[in-house]
């Protein structure tokens, strides 16, 4: 059996994802920050770090990571497949702090990514809510 090299980037990334899945945000933040410092930030690393910060309740730190991810995506020649994740994480942060900004961002996200599964699910839930609400209309 092969042992894992604890310093290998893939091992560190997998460890951070396991920590995230188990709500161990401090360990995940440490691992992801270390990876960003060693290899440079990427949109995926910044999104994962933001998710860990959201779990820990550090919404301002998460928004900082997400802003960095948006800035980084603007520097790329082609759109990043991780960009929708950045918007969804921002929505998660803003939902509890600024509902007006969250609603505006949701509108922008829905316009830019109309076929994204998140947008489709939101449209389905809006329709279901409207149908149930119509049953109770006075």
Regions found by a protein language model. Give the residues of each.
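Amphipathic alpha-helical interface segments within eukaryotic helical scaffold
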Residues: 1-32
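A hydrophobic, small-residue-rich beta->alpha segment in the mid-to-C-terminal subdomain
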Residues: 69-73, 81-101, 108
């Amino acid at each position: 059996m092969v042992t894992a090299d604890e310093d290998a980037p893939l091992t560190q990334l997998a460890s951070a994802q396991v920590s995230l899945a188990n709500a161990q945000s401090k360990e995940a933040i440490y691992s992801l920050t270390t990876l960003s410092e060693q290899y440079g930030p990427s949109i995926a690393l910044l999104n994962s770090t933001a998710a860990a910060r959201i779990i820990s309740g550090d919404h301002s730190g998460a928004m900082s990571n997400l802003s960095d991810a948006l800035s980084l995506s603007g520097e790329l020649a082609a759109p990043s497949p991780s960009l929708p994740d950045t918007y969804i994480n921002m929505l998660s942060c803003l939902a509890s702090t600024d509902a007006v900004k969250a609603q505006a961002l949701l509108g922008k996200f829905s316009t830019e990514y109309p076929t994204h599964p998140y947008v489709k699910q939101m449209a389905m839930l809006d329709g279901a809510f409207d149908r149930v609400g119509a049953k109770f209309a006075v």
